A protein has these predicted regions:
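Second-shell loop/turn segments in exported
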Residues: 1-3, 23-26, 62-64, 87, ...
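Extracytoplasmic "Venus flytrap"
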Residues: 1-11, 30-32, 132-135
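Sec/Tat-exported extracytoplasmic proteins
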Residues: 2, 16-21, 42-43, 48-54, ...
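Short helix-initiation/N-cap motifs at beta->coil->alpha
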Residues: 3-4, 25-37, 153-165
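Short, polar/charged alpha-helical segment
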Residues: 4-23, 39, 141-145
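Pocket-flanking alpha-helical
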Residues: 32-63, 74-77, 162-167
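Ligand-binding pocket segment of bilobal, Venus flytrap-like solute-binding proteins
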Residues: 44-45, 123-170
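A conserved helix-loop-strand patch within extracytoplasmic ligand-binding domains
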Residues: 69-126
């Protein structure tokens, strides 16, 4: 996947596989959809995937609020075996969760303390994100469906590494 933490994970997997006697070659292959298609097509052998991404994006399944991490993992593991003939390995301790970040000054100025506040006061905000987040069910569309609103003055799409610079420039 094409962002910093994935570059780190990819290189870590390459090192661990090499040290375990495998001849591993890490090659970034794009975003979630590109990596998924590449593994289904046999173009790559392994890549780190998030169970939430697998559930919502690749399998097109709905998240149910009663599903904990173990249920999501089991659902993804079973469906990947059945639908794609792919083995989902045991989860690592690595975790990635989306959060919304804004400066304290801007939050104070607009009276924003919760995600619900952002949903109703977004008209004054410029939202920096990736193209993928604007399209994913667990991204901006999911926020809009869950909270309503989330209509920003502007949505600026940028690479992951550029968002901190964007936030600091405001």
């Amino acid at each position: 996947k094409d962002f910093t933490e994935q570059y780190v994970l990819g290189n870590l997997y390459e090192i661990l596989l090499d040290e375990s006697g495998f001849d591993a070659d890490y090659r970034p292959a794009g975003g979630s959809s590109e990596n998924h298609q590449a593994i289904v097509n046999g173009e790559i052998d392994l890549y780190p995937e998030y169970t939430g991404t697998a559930l919502l994006t690749h399998l097109g399944l709905e998240f149910d609020s009663t599903m904990d991490a173990d249920v999501v993992y089991a659902t993804v593991k079973d469906a990947y075996a059945q639908d794609f003939n792919l083995a989902v390995l045991e989860p690592t301790d690595f975790n990635n969760t989306y959060v919304l970040v804004m400066t304290k000054a801007k939050a104070s100025e607009l009276g924003i303390e919760t995600v619900s506040d952002i949903s109703t006061k977004g008209g004054d905000l410029v939202f920096g994100t990736t193209q993928e987040f604007t399209e994913r069910d667990d991204g901006l569309p999911g926020l809009r469906e869950t909270y309503g609103g989330f209509n920003f003055k502007e949505v600026v799409r940028s690479a992951h590494a550029q968002r901190l610079r964007l936030l600091n420039s405001m």
